[in-house]
Amino acid sequence: MSQASAQHTPMMAQYLKIKREHPEVLLFYRMGDFYELFYDDAKRAASLLDITLTQRGQSAGQPIPMAGVPYHSAESYLARLVKSGESVAICEQIGDPATAKGPVERKVVRIVTPGTLHDEALLDARRDNLVLAVHPQGDRWGLAWLELSSGHFSVLEVDGESDLLSEIQRLDPAELLAAESLSLPPALAERPGFRRQSDWLFDLESATRLLCDQFGVADLRGFGCAHLTTALTAAGVLIDYARDTQRSRLPHVTGIAVETRDEAVVIDAASRRNLEIDTNLGGGFDNTLASVLDTTATAMGSRQLKRWLNRPLRDIAQIQSRQAAVQCLIDADRHATLRDALKAIGDIERILARVALYSARPRDLARLRDALNALPALEHDLAELDEGTAIDALKHHIRPYPELAETLSRALVDNPPVVIRDGGVIGTGFDAELDEYRGLAEHAGDYLVELETRERERTGLVGLKVGYNRVHGYYIEIPRAQAREAPAEYIRRQTLKNAERFIIPELKEFEDKALSAKSRALAREKLLYDGLLETLNVDLQALQGTARALATLDVLACFAERALALDFVRPRLSDQPGLRIRGGRHPVVEHVSDHPFVPNDLMLDETRRLLVITGPNMGGKSTYMRQAALIALLAHTGSCVPADEAEIGPVDRIFTRIGSSDDLAGGRSTFMVEMTETATILHNATEHSLVLMDEIGRGTSTFDGLSLAWASAEHLVERRAFTLFATHYFEMTALTEPYDSVANVHLTAAEHRDGIVFMHRVEEGPASQSYGLQVAQLAGVPPRVVARAREKLATLEQQEVHQAGTRGGLGDSDAAAPQQADLFASAPHPVVEALEKLDLDAISPRQAMALLYEWREQC
């Protein structure tokens, strides 16, 4: 593509010039009814889209690879390209082909990237689609992220790569921007949608100036972020990127929200994955916490719900305000009414973003019209609710817009077409000029019949006809025999063998109007449509405030509905540390299970900070632990919780070390992954943290694993973190001896013949046995193997009993004690071994005294 322009046709020279300005993206070059791609773009698109790769003549002596997609169905192809991680520059014809000398003028009108989508067809309606920029300063990281399709713009600063990774995992951006020279962890640099930006763009002064221009302010102090210099640098790069891709000043991005880590319950990346908040371990949505809770009436409510679940609050006043709002909706029995009203609202948050970007389609405006018409009834319903809850702050924003509603109702037909280009969007009676053009185009036939009848009567020429052809336009045709009698005002237009054709001033005037009526109607309709967008943009900020308030109301109504439908209870929020749960349940397991869920109690307080949980595999240990974390999480979002009763103290972090998996790409074994996650917990857990530790130490030798598990538990006891510690090392149950704040609980099971019945009930004390062979039998291990395992187990247990007897005569130990070797039992001391072997009757008193002195030295 570097050949001189003279070697190319004018059209191809134009293409190459535009392509040079956008080398890193695919270029959709508009030619008539197609978007064409050339050269390497064509090859890549043909491969990704499975479309035909062809050629378009030659340029510079070489065949030009070409591929294309129809203009009218471009969205589906764009969706596939974006899903593949591609970005696409849309180059449109902006000149008039009729008047163009040479190639029609074209320019790139926007760049479609994974993180800057706003077209409805390209987005997941119920998930945020973010573009995020990062910038470091020492160990401090600044993050800025934008949801272009709604206008949400936020910043945050964190310390260290661990917190950075945690926040990026929470936000899950579709695109990630960073400086070219910045060294990033592989987990970020290898993310889909990762984009490098020029280093010089990351400049605080330029960023501040750009942000002030975006928000129309002199400085950023009013947003409470002027001190966040690292995050603001990232924010400036982000706004510049979004403006460039959209070719717009982004009028719907009117402010910036500041987040801090201290405001929310921190959930690190591993814990978020293990809890399956809105993404399951397979990367899907099914069987997640959000899948059970999300009965929101609108897509914007669904997105808000996921934000709340992924960022539980710590401020008790805010949480209680939400709780009170949910309780108010339940008590007033209004949640169902409100949810029905909200269904008529739709996703106006994203519609308004498209309005701001002048990309809203006719059906967007029709949905907005319907939403505005639904607001008066919704306002009335809210007015009847009690004061003193989170709903109070919403009432100010959820209000009617009668003038806008009336304008849209008059302007739009009931069911407009998908696009404006073919007309039929603006209703009759809204604009007299448009009605006139349409009348001319639609009723031309009626006029011609009426003119023909009138002229026959006026002239007396019974053979007179009015007609039309593409070459000569409209005409009055008179048979040759009667042509001499044509009135003087008839102007001859065409002579035929058997007739003469004439034009008259009235018909000429009609012709001028009729032939251009359709194009004029389309142009007028487009002008009126743009006028509607301008009118809506005047009230854009207020409308955005209404949309956000409606999304919040939707979540609160969803919480109320779920509380009633799933038998959730309002938790008490306490300033006393701990979790006190009676009849707690796992919300997801209960929802998807075909069997009744067995509820269990949980007591963690100042005197009981770590529970050692034992019991058989499949007995429910992991479920019991996860439900505790999910109940704490839900309580901090303001939701009711799955329990008979719950009192939740302050929680600053939720940690989980559950499950096992290799990190093959990162070159880490299962055990390395486990130890990395454990290290994060041990370094960061506080006295207000909730920690779930499941089967620590499984990936190494028994002695190493048990030692690590014991030491980790001791460390958590010393840090006073609230901990649920599940283990198959029965020696761990001895932690209750040195530590008063440790207690034992176990999941019950009962043997039935050669099988096992899991009771899923949590009881005090350690488990009596592991039931490993019974679980193996349930799993389908061959009977011969299970039988051989039983034989081996009996041998090992007999050896253990014998060894215990020789060590200290413990053969009569408590029958309830687990039959498992005490791996922490001390090895016999050399003095003890010598004493055991000594024949006391065969030595003299002097020899006995000498041995005592020798043994004392050894001790």
UniProtKB/Swiss-Prot annotation:
GO cellular component: cytosol
One of the protein's GO biological processes: mismatch repair
Entry GO MF terms: ATP binding; ATP-dependent DNA damage sensor activity; damaged DNA binding; mismatched DNA binding
InterPro entries xrefs: DNA_mismatch_repair_MutS, DNA_mismatch_repair_MutS-lik_N, DNA_mismatch_repair_MutS/MSH, DNA_mismatch_repair_MutS_C, DNA_mismatch_repair_MutS_clamp, DNA_mismatch_repair_MutS_core, DNA_mismatch_repair_MutS_N, DNA_mismatch_repair_MutS_sf
Assigned keywords, A-Z: ATP-binding, DNA damage, DNA repair, DNA-binding, Nucleotide-binding
Biological role stated in the UniProt entry: This protein is involved in the repair of mismatches in DNA. It is possible that it carries out the mismatch recognition step. This protein has a weak ATPase activity.
Protein name per the record: DNA mismatch repair protein MutS
Native source organism of the sequence: Chromohalobacter salexigens (strain ATCC BAA-138 / DSM 3043 / CIP 106854 / NCIMB 13768 / 1H11)
